[in-house]
UniProtKB/Swiss-Prot annotation:
Transmembrane segments: none annotated. InterPro entries: Cyt_trans-like, NadD/NMNAT, Rossmann-like_a/b/a_fold. It comes from Synechococcus sp. (strain JA-2-3B'a(2-13)). This is Probable nicotinate-nucleotide adenylyltransferase. The gene is nadD. It catalyses: nicotinate beta-D-ribonucleotide + ATP + H(+) = deamido-NAD(+) + diphosphate. It is an enzyme of class 2 (transferase).
């Protein structure tokens, strides 16, 4: 039986933007994936959530952003989990539910640098292949990967994709000061943000 190839793209998506979509699309083709599974975080242990949108809002925005892509899907696994969202627990659940799958995890180079400090990092590193997404402001991806590989048994490749400075932090700041986010997020996401008056307060 041919194993399906699925990459998980986790994040707070607070809000989701075109940088996330470009990353997912490039990973899909570079690694010949069957699917990219978007995984909005519930209560991430490594990154405190900025205020402005509820779990339900962040989930809804991801679903709107990927609605027209037949090989993108959204999981509610972490959003619906009570307590902290640990990556290793998510992976164990997915592996159990879909055993005939080669799992990948798309990770930004900034998060990769901290991977050795993640919960049960050594076992986590072994559970899947890692796709490292470069970032303009996060250092050389190859050097970071080399440093992490010296500490963890990791199989990883670097994603060949445009490096954008666009971030959810920037978008929240734009909204708070009344600026435009047109062309930075999908139109449906912008409409949702405006309709629900998200991110207006700092």
């Amino acid at each position: 039986m041919k194993h399906r190839r699925i990459a998980i793209l986790g994040g707070t998506f607070n809000p989701v933007h075109h940088g996330h979509l470009i990353m997912a699309e490039q990973a899909l083709w570079q690694f010949d994936l069957d699917q990219v599974l978007w995984m909005p975080a519930g209560d991430p242990p490594h990154k405190p959530l900025a205020p402005g949108a509820s779990k339900a809002d962040r989930l809804a925005m991801v679903k709107l952003a990927i609605a027209d892509h037949e090989r993108f899907a959204c999981s509610e696994l972490e959003i619906r989990r009570s307590g902290r969202s640990y990556t290793i627990e998510t992976l164990r659940t997915l592996i159990q539910e879909q055993p005939n799958t080669q799992w990948y995890w798309i990770i930004g180079v900034d998060a990769l640098r901290d991977l050795p400090q993640w919960y049960q990092a050594e076992e986590l590193a072994r559970l899947c292949h890692w796709i490292v997404a470069p970032r303009v402001d996060a250092g050389d991806a190859a050097q970071v990967l080399q440093a992490v590989a010296a500490k963890l048994p990791i199989q990883a490749q670097i994603l060949e994709a445009p490096t954008l400075t666009l971030s959810s932090t920037y978008l929240r700041q734009q909204i708070q000061k009344g600026g435009s986010i047109r062309y930075l997020v999908p139109p449906a996401v912008e409409h949702y943000i405006r309709q629900h008056r998200l991110y207006l307060q700092p």
